[in-house]
Amino acid sequence: MANSEQAYWLAWSQVKGVGPVLLKRLAQHFELLENAWKARPIALGEVEGFGHKMIEKIIGQRNNLNPFQFLEEHQQKNPQFLTPDDPDYPRLLWEIPSPPPVLYYLGRLDHRESQGQIPGVGIVGTRYPTDHGSRWTRKISQALVKSGFTIVSGLAAGIDADAHSSCLRVNGRTIAVLGTGLDLIYPPQNRQLFEQIAAEGLILSEYPVGSKPERGNFPARNRIIAGLSRAVLVMEAPPKSGALITAKYANEFNRDVFSLPNSPDVQEAHGCLNLIHNGAEVILSENQLLASLGAIPLLDQGQEQKILPGDRQIGYLDQTNVPTLTTGARGKQPLTEPPEDLEPTLKKILAAVQEEPTALDQIVAVTALAIGDVSAGLLQLEILGLVSQEPGMRYQRR
């Protein structure tokens, strides 16, 4: 049965311009989103990232939406979902800078898993793996579940499907994170695997029923895979693989990143080899991996924790104690000129990034693009050397 705070989380998730980053700030500032919903404009203005124009838009949308009526209507098609006030909302996921405000699910929730007491490991990779990549994915997945880990992946073809199916084959626990609504199986050939995970594991999505596989959904989905995981394994990935986005998020969220090596002659190995070159741990064997994962500190199991938005979480990912790389003072250095043939969408995103750190949600609001499209675009702009990422999911021009 839904509580009143759940109604306000759901309502705020419908307000355009207020994405996951700003919504978390609201929750931390007001403690209850009911308080934020009823707050006067001057009080909203006290929250970082809420300017005069945005507040005007928020007030207009707020006046046209009844949270409890919307909740009742929404539950007719989406009966099972979590919001961060729920004790089964994943503890690790709340600690990332952009936790999904609504998490729809099929299958069986595990409270100890939600509290981080049963560790999850993300396994990702290309949709077109070699025999080497598939074979090692199956070996590693089964070794992990036999040691008590939960496997987290994205239900895509290739490495994802290998990870899920091999886990289930030995009666292991697996979580699939979708880039669509729970009513749409993508890719269609994974229907049987989808049904098996729904029966024996857990399927999650931040998208409501009816959401199609839009291009921008999948980079956003990847942050959830990284957020749920204590470590992320990239088993095989060519240079532009989406699995590398998951690895990037994992690094930002202070998760360990592991990568499976292969010959430089194999195109599918180039992304993995680049990760290793940049500091990812090498997967050499099942035992070596298990030993490395065993060195990751456990979450405090002595205190069961319901997520309270106003509290600073003390757990595996305490961002206040994580050393971060920051850029030095820019001075009068000229900005990098973008290439003349830069894609229109990337130009639009770049124009929304300021010389001072700009919040992700602000970029989303200015561009009016989906958060997944913006995240993917910012990653490309980083690779081109046009923007840099700062702590707190902020970006600035370079």
From Swiss-Prot:
Signal peptide: none annotated. GO terms for biological process: DNA-mediated transformation. InterPro entries: DprA, DprA_WH, RuvA_2-like, WH-like_DNA-bd_sf. It comes from the Bacteria. Disulfide bonds: none annotated. It holds the Pfam family DNA_processg_A. Belongs to the DprA/Smf family. May help load RecA onto ssDNA. This is Protein Smf.
